[in-house]
Amino acid sequence: MVLENILEKIVKSKINWIKHRKKIQPLSSFQHNITLSDRNFIQALKNIHPALILEFKKHSPSLGILNDFNPEFVAKIYKKYASAISVLTDEKYFHGKFEFIPIIRNIAVQQPILCKDFFIDPYQIYLARYYQADSILLMLSILKDNQYRALEKLAYSLNMAVLTEINNKMELDRAINLNAKIIGINNRNLKNFSISTSNTYKLASKISKNTIVISESGINSYNQLRKFKNLVQGFLIGSALMSKKDLEHAVHKIITGNNKICGLTRVEDARMSKDFGAIYGGFIFCKSSKRYVNLKKAMNITKNVHMKYIGVFCNENISTISYIIDKIPLYAIQLHGNENQFYIDCLKKKIPKCVRVWKAISLNGEKKHANNLFDNVNKHVFDNIHGGSGTPFNWYLLKNYNLKNVILAGGLNIKNCISASDLGCFGLDFNSGIEISPGLKDKKKTFLIFRSLREHKTIIH
């Protein structure tokens, strides 16, 4: 479909929808059953920084059908991570339903629910609260000031919060004059549905610190959350999650990053790593390592816990690597020895195309990485001279280099994980910094690291 002036089409459609809904479900049939909201949307956004409003929607005008997830499935995942949950209720363009709200709310019992729709009539607010929404979205792009005030007043009378959405400087000025308590900056152009996160940069700095600011649309990576963390109080994230096959995996990638727990030797440690948010789990097949794991143990772990596993090898015969790939589902091979370009090229020819190759580069003060990068690899892992040493290298060596395909390793722990994340690498590789002893991971240390990454601050208790 042509996206030009899609907003005008949606509003025209909404007027007709309201007329029809009023006939089949008149206000008089349910108004007496409406109760006041008992979940505090504003407080939920203040509890953890950054706040995360995770969205349930099945369809998007710009992307089409996103998924076939049912609301129960999504609620069970979102309740573990969300400050609040947004539910799209527009039927024609987003395949939403008001009936989704109580389903999600009854499972996610701690989170307030944001009803996200194109509100133009008081009837819709009554309907949203009847279905147990705790807050609504009011878009200044489709409302005049007097309409906004009337709808806001009604929402407040039902103890509901209002997220005021703006798209440009003119709407921001209106929101400020209207004393909006929560302002959502939509990074999507509502006329053609293009996205630019620079909209948040341009507008957020002009808003009072006493106002809660939410960045909406186009948020799809942990690095974006990290970059915007001092500009806004939270994020509304929808399509970047709902378009992925593995929803919980997608949530982890956005809220804590592409992180790896290496040196796994036990099923319980792999399960813990996945539950806390690790995207990758590492098996060290180097026999000289204190964290060496044999094939039998690795096979048992992969059968019991499904995640993206990385096999770490040191100067190993390619035939041995191929044999192990046949036995366990490895996402990538990490080369941690003295493998040269010829070795890498030969390896790539022998292993399945779906298996990536990562190459570790050892750094010290005398050797900069620019002269030691390899071709034909998917990622580089920057580490200390000796992996698993528990000592970080001098991160100053990374200055002025593109780190988007670099995984940072070497002595990462609770004390330096936030500084490490601020470097902007693709991901972080944790090993000795979260251990009780070599190969045995510490639950508390692991939890605190991922909680710190989630909240973008060091948490030691």
Curated annotation (Swiss-Prot):
It catalyses: N-(5-phospho-beta-D-ribosyl)anthranilate = 1-(2-carboxyphenylamino)-1-deoxy-D-ribulose 5-phosphate; 1-(2-carboxyphenylamino)-1-deoxy-D-ribulose 5-phosphate + H(+) = (1S,2R)-1-C-(indol-3-yl)glycerol 3-phosphate + CO2 + H2O. GO terms for molecular function: indole-3-glycerol-phosphate synthase activity; phosphoribosylanthranilate isomerase activity. In the N-terminal section; belongs to the TrpC family. It comes from the Bacteria. Pathway: Amino-acid biosynthesis; L-tryptophan biosynthesis; L-tryptophan from chorismate: step 3/5; Amino-acid biosynthesis; L-tryptophan biosynthesis; L-tryptophan from chorismate: step 4/5. PROSITE patterns: IGPS. The lineage of its organism: Bacteria, Pseudomonadati, Pseudomonadota, Gammaproteobacteria, Enterobacterales. Residues 1-258 are annotated as: Indole-3-glycerol phosphate synthase. Keywords: Amino-acid biosynthesis, Aromatic amino acid biosynthesis, Decarboxylase, Isomerase, Lyase, Multifunctional enzyme, Tryptophan biosynthesis. InterPro entries: Aldolase_TIM (IPR013785), Indole-3-glycerol_P_synth (IPR045186), Indole-3-glycerol_P_synth_dom (IPR013798), Indole-3-GlycerolPSynthase_CS (IPR001468), PRAI_dom (IPR001240), RibuloseP-bd_barrel (IPR011060). Residues 259-461 are annotated as: N-(5'-phosphoribosyl)anthranilate isomerase. Signal peptide: none annotated. Bifunctional enzyme that catalyzes two sequential steps of tryptophan biosynthetic pathway. The first reaction is catalyzed by the isomerase, coded by the TrpF domain; the second reaction is catalyzed by the synthase, coded by the TrpC domain. Its EC number is 4.1.1.48, 5.3.1.24. One of its GO terms (biological process) is L-tryptophan biosynthetic process. This is Tryptophan biosynthesis protein TrpCF.
